[in-house]
Amino acid sequence: MSIQYQWLTKERNMILNINNIHTAEIDALPIDETWTMGEVKPSLMHSIHAYPAKFPPFITTKALQYAKQQGIDVHTVADIFCGCGTVAYEALANRKSFFGCDLNPVATLIARTKCRKYDSNEIKKYFKRIKKMFFSDSVDMDEYFCKNTRICYWFYPNQVYDLYKLRSSIISVVELDKYLDFFFCAFSSILKSCSKWLTKSIKPQIDPRKQTKDVWEEFCRQICKMERANESSEVVEENNAKILTQSVLDLNINEPFVDLLVTSPPYVTSYEYADIHQLSTLWLDYSPDYKHFRTGSIGSLYHSDDLRFNVPKLNQSGLSVVMQMYSIDKKQAKAIAQYYVNMQAVVKKICNVVRKGGACLFVIGNTEYKSVKIDNARHLAESLLNEGFYNVTIKRRKILNKILTPYRDKNGKFSSDKTSRKIYSEEFLIFAQI
């Protein structure tokens, strides 16, 4: 390696420690292009269901390579905010065991579906049976579906009836849980296109002029798409994957078992995942009220404790942000404080999950609200240092091909207006060993 290349590599990284954590100019780090774009086209399995702010698939493989360079022998990979299972799939494709959790049942449904290999003949067999039942006699609708105010708000009556018939057909026909997940994932993925939900809008918004799609045609199209994805999947039928529908903060771990944790925590003042996935939550009967999943959701603007309880728990980086926000917006300051306290608790929990000699790779971005920089990356790095992690290295990557609007208006709301502040064009990778 040339001296020049050594210098460039060094400058793309920054080692953080307790002495420089508050002064390090992490925003001045040059973009590390090697962590910006993958060399291999992502698997079709990553497109079986829409999901906001998807984790870049190639980062998991690069994280495994990086850990190997650091002398870490990786057998088990974990993602404690597993979302739709991007890290899960990539870990299994690299023949590693996987452990993941997420509070959102829609997310874990998608993740479980990605982590399995399916028999094409079984898919076709079940599909034929579902079709036969769907086009057979009429059904008497469950009162929950025909009178649910949220379902009636989002769907026209004929769509409600057809979706109910399809759901009932899937439940009646599919016997194995593995294939039930597959068909429920397909069902979930067509709900927005069959509803009044504004096309291409991530957040809930009615389009009164939207031409809704035919339920059966959309389902057929989605099953074909998922069949093609399954045929190209690199996941083997027998694999070691465990995915739990619960918060990382509620995990009961007897002893550390993970060699490498790869995850992207939620951002405060960003998405309310419970709201975004409300159609699937309602139709799959995960809860009669989607707002239930706001409780315990890290990064949610709801259910924050009083500032008097949270402020004393904050590290210096977190306290600095909260105090700046407090003078501008007390409600947001309260939500940010809760998020930072939760993330500090997450780092403590990670110490019970990742074994000594193991490592973590976090992908996290900073946000901005009413001209206050929400320095998530620095807060996370300080949290890691305070819990005894070492070799805390930070890089900066450019965001590409992500379902994320990179602009906010003057009030901090998402906007497609390029004259607004661009705050999501880059994000940070934080590597830390324990």
Please report, for each region that a protein language model flagged, where it lies by residue.
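S-adenosyl-L-methionine
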Residues: 1-70
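Conserved proline-anchored active-site loop of SAM-dependent methyltransferases
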Residues: 60, 77-94, 98-105, 111, ...
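Short helix-loop-beta connector
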Residues: 67-76, 94
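Conserved phosphoryl-transfer catalytic core
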Residues: 106-173, 279-310
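SAM-dependent nucleic-acid methyltransferase catalytic core
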Residues: 160-263, 268-276
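SAM-dependent methyltransferase catalytic-core segment centered on the flexible catalytic loop
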Residues: 267-349
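Conserved helix-to-beta-strand junction in the class I
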Residues: 346-356, 387
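Core SAM-dependent methyltransferase catalytic element
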Residues: 351, 355, 411-434
